[in-house]
From Swiss-Prot:
PANTHER family assigned: LEUCINE-RICH REPEAT-CONTAINING PROTEIN 34
Presence of the UniProt keyword Nucleotidyltransferase in the record: no
Subcellular location(s) per record: Nucleus; Nucleus, Nucleolus; Cytoplasm
Entry comment describing in which tissues the protein is expressed: Expressed in testis where it specifically localizes to germ cells (at protein level). Not detected in other tissues tested (at protein level). Expressed in pluripotent embryonic stem cells and multipotent adult germline stem cells.
Name this protein carries in UniProt: Leucine-rich repeat-containing protein 34
Lineage: Eukaryota, Metazoa, Chordata, Craniata, Vertebrata
Gene field: Lrrc34
Quaternary structure annotation from Swiss-Prot or TrEMBL: Interacts with NPM1 and NCL.
GO biological process: cell differentiation; gene expression; telomere maintenance
């Protein structure tokens, strides 16, 4: 099999195009890895936000030549070109690649300036594709037009398992369409519908997703950040969770949920035995909401493994109550509390949990330290999805402590 770097150089000279040094460097490293481990599958990782690799971000024309290089390469199972400038031109060649390269199971096109037209091309390519498992379109403004075509695609495609359309400027019509399609689709295990463009205060998106969760028993992971969700919307989801037996990871961070919403959530957690990861970060559940949760976690729930209440206006009493629940509930292993109001009792409580070994340092976002015989807590770079938007450019690319949600509920191989 011809080396990737040599094939790329040949295609550039044949089409009278300059080689991109960034792509050359990545393909050279990949060739070396393939030579060492010829039977393994590899992902081509050409992230445009990698500061250690000098070179310009790749364009649609660059991606055209790269996609031709990758054809008929059975050892390539993934393509990650996040944070580049491939645009709708690159989306055209990405669609061609999906049609002609059956070994690809993972495609990451996040933040690539792809619009509705590019979204349409990729969605249509997936009508007949039977191998792609995970697609990330995060941050590409495909809008309502592109989003509706992806929803239509899910009626035809029975192999895609995880789809990320976060920050894609989807409209309410799209959210309703996905909710409708997912009542029938038996393949999708994870979906991200973060930050749709919604108008009005009626919380229609959560009502429709709630109806879908009552019918769908395949979906494992659901992200609904920035839906403008209030307590009524959370109540709709909680009503669905009484009937749902598959959802293990629920992300409702960055919404408008308050203490009253925790009454519904605490109640459903008494009987729901499926949910394992719950992200409530950047809401406003306050001390009362934390206490509702801690009561359920102490006396009833024995299935939740990870809870994030980062930046929720919780004071010491609520944080201590959550720490106390961990002493009796031995299933809850991960808790994230940074951004709340720590008092000395809070610092002592979490310091004791860590020192006793009940709470592992990798499973929380705080670390105790002492000054003048007083204990304080500092922030640690751990969380449920710290590497959702970016990945480190050195050391381990995947750290379970920084992406605990995906480590506890793995849907697909990649973030």
């Amino acid at each position: 099999m011809e080396k990737l770097q040599a094939q790329y150089c040949y295609l550039c000279s044949e089409n009278i195009r300059k080689t991109n040094p960034f792509i050359l460097n990545i393909l050279q490293k990949l060739d070396e890895e393939i030579e060492k481990r010829p039977k393994e599958k590899f992902t081509v990782n050409i992230a445009g936000n990698n500061r250690l690799d000098s070179g310009q971000r790749i364009t649609g024309e660059d991606f055209w030549l790269l996609s031709k290089t990758l054809r008929n390469q059975p050892c390539i199972s993934g393509v990650d070109v996040r944070y580049n400038l491939i645009g709708d031109v690159g989306a055209f060649y990405a669609a061609k690649l999906l049609q002609k390269q059956p070994s690809i199971t993972y495609l990451n096109l996040m933040f690539n300036d792809i619009g509705p037209e590019g979204g349409e091309l990729i969605a249509k390519a997936l009508h007949k594709n039977k191998t792609l498992k995970y697609l990330r379109m995060t941050g590409n403004k495909i809008e309502n037009t592109g989003g509706m075509l992806f929803a239509a695609m899910l009626q035809m495609n029975s192999s895609l398992e995880k789809l990320d359309l976060g920050d894609c400027d989807l409209g309410l019509q799209c959210v309703i369409a996905f909710s409708t399609v997912l009542t029938q689709n038996q393949a999708i295990k994870g979906i991200n519908l973060n930050r749709p463009i919604l108008y009005g205060e009626q919380e229609e998106s959560t009502v429709h997703i709630g109806h879908m969760l009552k019918e769908n028993h395949v979906l494992v992971e659901l992200h609904m950040c920035k839906h403008g969700m209030k307590n009524y919307g959370l109540q709709q989801l909680c009503n669905a969770l009484y009937l749902n037996s598959s959802l293990r990871y629920l992300d409702v961070s960055c919404n408008k949920i308050t203490r009253d919403g925790m009454v519904f959530l605490a109640d459903v957690l008494k009987s729901n035995t499926t949910l394992e990861v719950l992200d409530l970060s950047f809401n406003r559940i306050e001390t009362a909401g934390a206490k509702y949760l801690s009561e359920t976690l102490t006396s009833h729930n024995r299935s939740l493994k990870a809870l994030s209440v980062v930046s929720n206006k919780i004071e010491g009493e609520g944080l201590v109550a959550l720490s106390q629940s961990m002493k009796t509930n031995l299933v809850l292993s991960n808790i994230y509390i940074w951004g709340n109001k720590f008092d000395e009792d809070t610092c002592v409580a979490y310091s004791d949990l860590i020192k006793s070994g009940r709470l592992k340092p990798d499973n929380t976002d705080v670390e105790p330290y002492m000054v003048d015989e007083h204990i304080y807590l500092s922030e640690v770079s751990n969380g449920l999805k710290r590497h959702y938007y970016w990945a480190p450019t050195y050391g381990e690319t995947y750290m379970p402590s920084s992406s605990a949600g995906f480590a506890l509920v793995p849907v697909g191989e990649h973030l």
